Amino acid sequence: MTEPSIVITGLALRLPGADDQEQFWKLLIEGEDRTRPVSRQRRALAGRPDWDDVIGEVEGIEMFDAEFFGIDEDEAVFMDPQHRMVMELAYEAVCDAGLLESKRTAERRYSVYMAMSTNPYYPLVSRHLDEHGPAGVHPRTIMNLHP
């Protein structure tokens, strides 16, 4: 009996200084370090004015097309930025693999595997949960809400 094949056919990413594969490879080849001192805005949002560190920040996290994903704008505002990015990246990975153009997509099984790091977003918005509900806010929900 033969084992089913596993093929990686699509890739999507968001990293500091790289929004796609080409930018990522360029950073690798050039050996560029995209970490920067924590910005004043980031320190203020975190409530840590004395935060003296370097971090790698992904740009454009506020650029989310809630309507495209069928999400109410009010809910999208409270969604963890990583959750919004997961939705975009899952879609981009499927597109990169050419699965949306395939007439056989419905006949096969596909998976999107992701990795993410922790972040302080949940504590920043948790006081608003009663008002807007928990969907898309708690980090444990991020990988579970996508068909």
Language-model segments: what does each one mean?
Residues 1-147:
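Cys-dependent condensing catalytic cores that perform Claisen condensation/acyl-transfer
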